[in-house]
Curated annotation (Swiss-Prot):
Gene that this sequence comes from: hisF
Protein name, per record: Imidazole glycerol phosphate synthase subunit HisF
Gene3D superfamilies noted in UniProt: Aldolase class I
Molecular function GO terms recorded: imidazoleglycerol-phosphate synthase activity; lyase activity
This protein's pathway: Amino-acid biosynthesis; L-histidine biosynthesis; L-histidine from 5-phospho-alpha-D-ribose 1-diphosphate: step 5/9
Amino acid sequence: MLKRRIIPCLDVKAGRVVKGVAFLNHRDAGDPVELAAAYDAGGADELVFYDITASSDERAIMVDVVERTAAQVFIPLTVGGGLRTVEDMYRMLRAGADKVSINTAAVLNPQLIEDGARRFGSQCIVLSIDARRVNASDEPPRWQVFTHTGRDPRPTGLDAIEWARRGVELGAGEIVINSMDEDGVGGGYDIDLLRAITEAVNVPVIASGGVGSPEHMYAGLVEGRADAVLAASIFHFGAYTIRDVKQYLAERGVPVRL
């Protein structure tokens, strides 16, 4: 049985790791390279860097962060944020990333998924989806895709489930599904959303947004059927270690790399 993955997520702004609530009110969490090395030593299965820097002229900082991180860690590294072209993807992969994650740019130009997959292989292309529940309380669950979530969330009119399916058809090899309603809150993943996505696609799905405890990760992996779980605050600020989480999951029969 495939091992379930525990993946720390590092939001990088102007060369520092930050974490906010619902994409706002950022707290400094440290140096990205130092944190990445600590997570590697602490048993993380992969790492995700999201560049949330507002200005494109600081993008070179992220390339430097990726290069220095890749020189120190030996687990897969995914990089996203501000990647708008195949050349942007190439720059990050050349710097040392194993995978690239695209979100807003893919919605604006779905061909980017196909072009990236054709050049680098589907295994390199991660489609990240920010979704918000939009149904009324007396309606079946429905989630809409939003873009520009770091600064100015914009509704797209796209159904999150349909967008995930289309992304896979275009060549995405993995899906990250992030609940905007739960992001940074610590109340747990949106299991309904997660389950809907995992049942709709045949590629690995990573749960994101809202984890506050090992119990939430267990729910995401077992009830939500995710292949991996992403977390930030609970690791960055010391609430739990990766080994704490893996021990908890292993004791409950979830296959993890110890």
